[in-house]
Amino acid sequence: MDTYTSAKINWFPGHMKKIHDQLKKLSSQIDGIIEIVDARAPTLTHNSEIISYFLNKPKLILALKTDLAQYKPNKKILFGSLKEPFKLKKKVLKTLTTLFANKRQQLKAKGLLIKQFRLAVIGMPNVGKSSLINLLINKNHLKVANRAGITKSLNWIQISPELLLSDTPGVFLKRIDEIQIGYKLVLTNVIRREVVNIEEVGMFAFNYLKKHYKQLLPFEADSFINFLEKFAKVRGLIKKANELNTNLACEIFINELINGKYGKLSYELN
């Protein structure tokens, strides 16, 4: 295999459209959002379609999985890792407090009681939304359901006297026209591998590493098929007919790359 045959990815299950519609409908009742992105591809895992429903709301963009990523600091993005839970929790709560400071002062000036700010945690599938909420909640957290004006489909969890969070299912982009972007989203575990050609993903990953991170490749090779043959031989991946199992080699290579076995990287290099 030397070329990519896929043209685009159009994978948008019906339940995701319902989530889109629901969030758009509830935007007036949500005070702010936390968008979780992948630090290996913060721009590619940013969901501008969902963000457009909350243009005038306070936003925290949090890039997780920094333990897998090579990244540059960005004033608009808070970077962190769930593998450093205490540090991450402290940074997130401090940032959220600052984010709503002005609103809190406005309410105090009017002699109003401090309201509970409702934050929707959004992001693409498998970026770490639920894991973040599990980190932020206390053992005796209060799960609030059926609040006035809030659909039963959204459960609100109290993480502080002033903050309520709602975890939303991962929502994917409606359409991806550039197949290479789709491959990168597979390699960050956002897109299920079943919807793409896994060999093409492996070939893309090999060529990407060869261009940008040659030192991370486990074996030197002139071509992708040569790489898979070396991989299968070294790992002892042999079929019954004593043939090299290059299909299994491809799957293992992708799994190990996703899990960071070869080192930190960014998927936003040209």
UniProtKB/Swiss-Prot annotation:
Q: Briefly, what is this protein's role?
A: Required for a late step of 50S ribosomal subunit assembly. Has GTPase activity. Binds to the 23S rRNA.
User: Which Pfam families does the record match to this protein?
Assistant: MMR_HSR1
Transmembrane ranges? Answer: none
Q: Which family does it belong to?
A: Belongs to the TRAFAC class YlqF/YawG GTPase family. MTG1 subfamily.
Q: Which GO terms describe its biological process?
A: ribosome biogenesis; translation
Q: Which residues form the CP-type G domain?
A: 20-174
Q: Which organism is it from?
A: Mycoplasma genitalium (strain ATCC 33530 / DSM 19775 / NCTC 10195 / G37)
Disulfide-bonded cysteines = none
Positions with a binding annotation for GTP: N126, V127, G128, K129, S130, S131, G170
Q: Which GO terms describe its molecular function?
A: GTP binding; GTPase activity
Does the keyword GTP-binding feature in the UniProt annotation? yes
Keywords associated with the record: Cytoplasm, GTP-binding, Hydrolase, Nucleotide-binding, Ribosome biogenesis
Top-level taxon of origin: Bacteria
Q: Is-annotated flag, keyword Cytoplasm?
A: yes
* Subcellular localization, as worded in the UniProt entry: Cytoplasm
| Listed PANTHER family | MITOCHONDRIAL RIBOSOME-ASSOCIATED GTPASE 1 (PTHR45782:SF4)
Any one of the GO CC terms: cytoplasm
Gene transcribed to yield this protein: rbgA
Q: What is this protein called?
A: Probable ribosome biogenesis GTPase A
Tell me which InterPro entries the record gives. Answer: G_CP_dom, GTP-bd, GTP-bd_ortho_bundle_sf, GTP-bd_ribosome_bgen, GTPase_MTG1, P-loop_NTPase
